[in-house]
Amino acid sequence: MNIKEGKFLETILAEKKQEIAQMPDENSKPIRQTYRLYDYLKKHSDQLQVIAEVKKASPSLGDINLEVDIIAQAKNYEQAGAAMISVLTDPVFFKGNIEYLREISKNVQIPTLNKDFIIDKKQINRALNAGATVILLIVACFENDFEKLEELYNYAISLGLEVLVETHNKAELDRAHQLAAKIIGVNNRNLKTFEVSLQNSTDLVPYFKEENVYISESGIFGKKEAQKVAENFNGILVGTALMQANNLTKSLTDLKIKRKNDEH
């Protein structure tokens, strides 16, 4: 599906509403047992931690790695020291599938993140039942409806899920803090234009709160970019660079930069 420039998020959300309308309403099951991401990031704050993403395609890059064996990729991420595996489940724009999350979650011991444009409780139940222990809530998806964001956040927490709350600017970061979110992402990609700049991460650092953990997302392709954010971020979310890596273990290990501000 083609997306008009500047209308990325709008187009995706319109499609997502159609997807949700067809989605069965599942009863939530008990959460899969693994460590808590927040606790892990606090405990291992001496190194920049990597959230490694299973991503076959994206609207900005097109096909990234369609032939990948998703279970082998996920197991390799786990063995290489990823803190969590992010799994894209959007079928239309990212060629993802909820079954990828289900299969990966069955085959790894570490936390899994349902990476999707979540705007409804049905999606949260589905994520939990597919083995996710963390879900993504993107503040930009709730531009004029903070109450809905808060409702979904609290609902996910009530089920035992952790929530990565994604922000892109100061106003959205304020929203995340207002929620009392503990795990906050800063997306270096503008979801309206899909342009990427690490400046997004840098600009928001002065407003960080010591009790939270912060993840820099998008635009991190190697050691150089990782070093730029390592001092102020607990972790990074990396997809394309790892999906295309010739030596996955080395590529992931290289990203785990020693951090100066060890919080122990």
Swiss-Prot record:
PROSITE patterns: IGPS. GO terms for biological process: L-tryptophan biosynthetic process. Its EC number is 4.1.1.48. GO terms for molecular function: indole-3-glycerol-phosphate synthase activity; phosphoribosylanthranilate isomerase activity. Keywords: Amino-acid biosynthesis, Aromatic amino acid biosynthesis, Decarboxylase, Lyase, Tryptophan biosynthesis. The keyword Repeat does not apply. InterPro entries: Aldolase_TIM, Indole-3-glycerol_P_synth, Indole-3-glycerol_P_synth_dom, Indole-3-GlycerolPSynthase_CS, RibuloseP-bd_barrel. Pathway: Amino-acid biosynthesis; L-tryptophan biosynthesis; L-tryptophan from chorismate: step 4/5. It catalyses: 1-(2-carboxyphenylamino)-1-deoxy-D-ribulose 5-phosphate + H(+) = (1S,2R)-1-C-(indol-3-yl)glycerol 3-phosphate + CO2 + H2O. HAMAP family: IGPS_B (MF_00134_B). This is Indole-3-glycerol phosphate synthase. It comes from Lactococcus lactis subsp. cremoris (strain MG1363).
